[in-house]
């Protein structure tokens, strides 16, 4: 029993040590069972995925959260006051709501790809995450899933944004900006803007959950750690 608690404490220290910029108190990760450390980390990160997606993939998950709320594209934002004076304030509000609803609808579709990346995480990946920065796991997921997630989100978001008349106006304006070299072609639609902002919000929330786990791993996932290390003899 004492050995179980000792090994558990080593894992907790390893998970938290990144906040100190490296291995705390000279901890050698080789003192841990690689398989157990990796399994424990994956369980904690699986919980983080569920929490991040669960917070965003619901009504008002984006719209009522200032950290991730998708505001008007910069080109429209600059003209917002004038447009409201011209009587299109309702359309602007509808556009903001629609963009955020599109993001809320897309985020739940990320779970499959994120959990696929989690399954494919190697022991070396796990060690790098344990001793990395406070968002090392989030960066791993971002590198592994950003491109396929963007492809998955885009059509879901497009089905919502294409229903907004002001979105069509934005797209027309953006296309002109491309010809002038102001915008890149891939950024010239409302769909691409919202897709990028949705991904930004998702990874921001995942980083928050990761920091919470690193700060208080036992408080965040005590039952899973007991389960992982309870069988160690």
PLM segments and residue spans:
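Alpha-helical transmembrane segments and their juxtamembrane interface "caps"
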Residues: 56, 105, 109, 139, ...
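Bacterial N-terminal signal peptides that target proteins for export
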Residues: 1-10, 17
